[in-house]
Amino acid sequence: MAGKMKLFSVTSERPLATKIADYLDIPLCEVELQKFSDGEVKINIEESIRGTNAYVVQSMNSNVNERLMELLIMVDALKRASVHSINIIMPYYGYARQDRKARSREPITAKLMANLIQRAGADRLITVDLHAAQIQGFFNIPIDHLSAIPLIGDYLIENYGEKDVVVVAPDHSGVVRARRIADRLNAPIAILNRKPRPHEDEIMSVIGDVKGKVAIVVDDIIDTGVRATTSADILLEKGAVEVIACATHSVMAGNATERLQNSNIKEVITSDSIDLPEDKQFDKLTTISIGRILGRAIEGVQENRSLHPLF
């Protein structure tokens, strides 16, 4: 790819962007972001970037609407600064759970997100463990859909590989994700048969044997923590000796951290796709960095190499 590499962080993922910069051995470019009294945002890039390949790190965490607007303004600033290409590094893709019309007269906001990012001028999106892989089809630009599952799998092998484990999909749609972890651990899988009702979390049955085993529940997102804690309760009721909760993205909305810390879950394993503030940290939480795989992805894009090993 023609053009020198330039790495930017807008607001949401400065710690992760710093890890990526350290891996690539390049500095983060200076960006001045002003917020006016009415909430408007203004961005100024503090150096010449004409003809470069811009890589912008921005997750859709905390206030997703504000993060999205910052990103769109940043993309516009880069385009008007005559960069060669604009590559978005969005570890956590916001609105991913609104990927279809579940009921009549509902929007498909994940598609709207794709439209906005493309119309603003982005040339590529690099993301991690989309809630629904088919969201890739909402884009007409290249998407590199990476996964934190291998990193989480390696951690589980190191810490639970000698134990009798079962990998649990929290619902039927999570079986593929659970299977990837189970294959790495050479372990069986179980499935929680949930009743698909909005605003309810009722588990009707457990499909598979969990008795006497360490149950590892694998999900893509931990939001309020209710789904993880109810999963743990039913698995322990069915005879599991311990429950470990894993998810790539830790939203930790509301009192999720308190709920998880006080739950029957032994350990919560997640990535740094979302930067959690100090008040969202808790003793049971283990965070695995995805900075290296994102850095390798940027290297691959920059040097026109295959990213297949990162998927």
UniProtKB/Swiss-Prot annotation:
Its chief place of residence is: cytoplasm
Any one GO biological process: purine nucleotide biosynthetic process
PROSITE patterns in alphabetical order: PRPP_SYNTHASE
- Its Enzyme Commission number? 2.7.6.1
Q: What SUPFAM superfamilies is this protein classified in? A: PRTase-like
Provide the residue positions that the database annotates as binding D-ribose 5-phosphate: 219
User: Which superkingdom is the protein from?
Assistant: Bacteria
Sum up the protein's function in the record's words. Answer: Involved in the biosynthesis of the central metabolite phospho-alpha-D-ribosyl-1-pyrophosphate (PRPP) via the transfer of pyrophosphoryl group from ATP to 1-hydroxyl of ribose-5-phosphate (Rib-5-P).
Quaternary structure (record): Homohexamer.
Q: Mind telling me what this protein is named?
A: Putative ribose-phosphate pyrophosphokinase 2
